[in-house]
Amino acid sequence: MDVENLIITTLKDKVKELTGTEMDIRLEEPPAINMGDYSTNISFRLAKDLKKAPKMIAEDIANSLSISGIERIEAVNGYINFFMNYPDFSKETVSKITSEKENFGKLEKRGEKVILEHTSANPNGPFHIGHGRNMVIGDSLKRILIASGYDVETQYYVNDMGRQEAIVVFGNERFELDKSKKADHAIGEVYVETNKLLAENEELEQEILNLMKNYESACEAGIENELTEKFKNAVDYSLGGFKETLSTLNIYHDKFVWESEFVKSGMVRDVIKRLMDTGKVVEDEVFRLDLSDYGLEKKLVLARLNGTSLYSTRDIAYHINKMENCDFAVNLLGADHKLTAVLVNKTLALLGYNEAEVVFYEFISLPEGSMSTRRGRFISMDELFEEAKSRAAEEVRKRGVAQSEEEIEEIAKKIAVGAVRYNIVRIAPEKPMVFRWDEALDFEKVGCPVIQYAHARCSRILENVENISNDNLFAYEMNENEKTIVKLLSKLPKIVEKAAEVRKPQIVANYVLDVAQGFNKFYANCPVLKEENETIKNSRLAIVSTTKTVLENTLDLLGIEMPGKM
């Protein structure tokens, strides 16, 4: 039973009865459960039409309503507060979670396909923590969209045609790859050394331009030769390292789409022709697309005068390919790409395609300072993860919960993944963030270990419980801690729906912390195994069991596993 929607429907009917018109109604949740579960201020909105004081209107409405699942309705200073029948609500919530298990929180299939592009870092060095923010938000959003009923395909757009990759190919001829190192790190070292070489020998720049031009010509002609093989090998080598990092963080892409595919297929050439035919292309030192009809002063640089493509043209071809194969597309991009994203979207609109949705994220840094791939000074995601794992292992040893170094390693890895992913995803993407270790590995207040520890507590309580009797569950006067946690558990499906709708995975992150904290208060104030009353004991065991399920399901939406013990 969806009590919230039932209240809204009943209130809408009441408003129509009183005024003859419809009113949009939203419910608030009072700050404390003893003030009610839901509240509305509609009496204040009706006062003018009904020519009565809000206090009187609230009392009249409260006295006239009877709603299934609501134990009582109170009018307080013009507000109408609704109190749920908790024994019935709790039985229903526990029953639903117990029967649906890992499917609790998942919504019905919508029959819509989404292409979600995230990470898409250039294959010229390891991921830094800026890429980490992209991949964590992107993968969490993918999981949430799937849970909300969408068919989601995740794509990684591989930039194999840019200047950066030409520098890597050029560098591979002059510097030896350190095969003892992780592939993307070895490539990154070559990239840094080659940049130094280019800075000291400007005449070599022409060789980079020649590599780019010759690679594009070969792709356009559909030729595979020694040069295309060099580009392919360099990119594949780097991607191998990328996939290791992604896998460590439980991130997997459905498809890696290479930029050169759209040159080889002739699609880029076709896009340039179609845009030329719009009459919106102007020529100076390059071809530019005039998008002033869309309120944009800046023109999109479309192609060189010799007709060869640029990144922007290939990006448009890629987006057309996406739009032709999905109901809608979502891109994860850094805030510094806002103008480019608008230019690409308006070009799509000009050609008659839907625009891609974009989730922008701001920069992330460590207290130690900034990052720069080109100069070779940055914090890689691999380093961040290893540091998290090392700190987590130290904490696990201190707590003495593991029997062997192997078990310490296993637990520490899950804590580290949780620390990194959760600390990134809990902050709204549009806010700049500083990654702080004392928050990421906080076992007391805001870190993922708080949530994982609550789950470990549930597991420990249930360890020797063979079965939980359903007889007379919640047939007693429940206290506020019990009511609060049950109400929180019931919210998961709506949390998933809302997070998917507004594309904000931090909603799920904040919710799961609320569940963990709500459970900890319940645990501190409600004896479970030591409770002598069997009805209360079984009811509380049911709360523990369903909390465990909700914590597992919710952290799975964020790509985080449970260590089991901590």
Swiss-Prot record:
This enzyme's EC code(s): 6.1.1.19
Keyword Glycoprotein in record: no
Enzyme class label: ligase
Primary location class: cytoplasm
Domain of life: Archaea
Catalytic activity: tRNA(Arg) + L-arginine + ATP = L-arginyl-tRNA(Arg) + AMP + diphosphate
A family per Pfam: DALR_1
Family annotation (CDD domains): ArgRS_core (cd00671)
GO BP annotation list: arginyl-tRNA aminoacylation
Locus of motif 'HIGH' region: 121-131
Location(s), subcellular: Cytoplasm
GO MF term set: arginine-tRNA ligase activity; ATP binding
Keywords per UniProt: Aminoacyl-tRNA synthetase, ATP-binding, Cytoplasm, Ligase, Nucleotide-binding, Protein biosynthesis
Gene3D superfamilies, A to Z: Arginyl tRNA synthetase N-terminal domain, HUPs, Isoleucyl-tRNA Synthetase, Domain 1
InterPro entries in alphabetical order: aa-tRNA-synth_I_CS, Arg-tRNA-ligase, Arg-tRNA-synth_N, Arg-tRNA-synth_N_sf, ArgRS_core, DALR_anticod-bd, Rossmann-like_a/b/a_fold, tRNAsynth_Ia_anticodon-bd
GO CC field: cytoplasm
Family, similarity comment: Belongs to the class-I aminoacyl-tRNA synthetase family.
Protein name: Arginine--tRNA ligase
Organism whose genome encodes this protein: Methanococcus maripaludis (strain C6 / ATCC BAA-1332)
